[in-house]
Amino acid sequence: PCSELIIGMKCGGSDGLSGITANPTVGIFSDLLIAQDGTTILTEVPEMFGAETLLMNRCENEEIFEQTVCLINDFKEYFTSHHQTIYENPSPGNKKGGISTLEDKSLGCTQKSGSAPVRGCLLMERQ
């Protein structure tokens, strides 16, 4: 049954067309699976930087909203604590393929999550 499926969605290399082709298609799949009690997980938190509010606006409740904010902020803090720039995305390959800004890439990432409510947030543990 679909309720036993858990699908993780990862960036496979974005270009100028993925935001109008593959990513929306994956989002539709995500919505269909969730409608059948399946689960999808949007991975690669740094890929969300720049479009995270789209996910936050879909959080099912205040607790999940706060967890999502915490997840994003923890990743940003991790980057800055290691002297890494947060907004050094997209990659040269993304740019060559037609993506010019972080927001372009991030919008593509969040499209893969579809439009269903965000019902959970897996927080990362630091070691």
Name every feature range the model reports, one short phrase each:
Residues 4, 9, 15-127:
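Anaerobic metallocofactor- and corrinoid-dependent redox/one-carbon enzyme cores
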Residues 1:
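Active-site cavity-forming subdomains of large catalytic enzyme subunits
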